[in-house]
């Protein structure tokens, strides 16, 4: 039986201005392509779906890419559980900005890695491409993340990009939980050894005192 529980995932769409963040988000939520470019300050959308047999409620934050809104970035980076890092394959500058966004996420989260998916958008404009697929794949490899080429206009790999991020979050959380459990197990295993060491020290002290003074040791 499939689960009816809807686990909420806070997804944040990040990238330079004009790369198609809003178009991707609205295609996911409304199955509609927004042709005109209207710079976003911050919009939030929610979508119920099922991913690998598990219910999910996607809370998607579509963010501003313009430099004048950069002060807002750290605020949404603190709350995001996973990030779509989006660039436009016809814009070299949008590709170059990805590393800056990624490093800022790691700094805010104080982590060496974090759930992200690298999204190369506007792949329907192949004739105008200036960032090769190989370059995108290499960048994704350096960030230890999945690489997806999308077209908001053609609705190509839109769901795959968002759903892959949810899967990445799930794997990351399981890994973090396992690491925490292992740490707890190590700490628990160390307690008896530490206790035994203290007990041994007390017994040795007691023996020495009994021999020399015949006094009782209170500890």
Swiss-Prot record:
SMART domains: RAB, RAN, RAS, RHO. Its EC number is 3.6.5.2. Keywords: Cell membrane, Cell shape, GTP-binding, Hydrolase, Lipoprotein, Membrane, Methylation, Nucleotide-binding, Prenylation. Palmitoylated by the erf2-erf4 complex. GO terms for biological process: conjugation with cellular fusion; establishment of cell polarity; establishment or maintenance of cell polarity; positive regulation of conjugation with cellular fusion; positive regulation of mating projection assembly; positive regulation of pheromone response MAPK cascade; positive regulation of protein import into nucleus; protein localization to plasma membrane. Belongs to the small GTPase superfamily. Ras family. This is Ras-like protein 1. It comes from Schizosaccharomyces pombe (strain 972 / ATCC 24843) (Fission yeast).
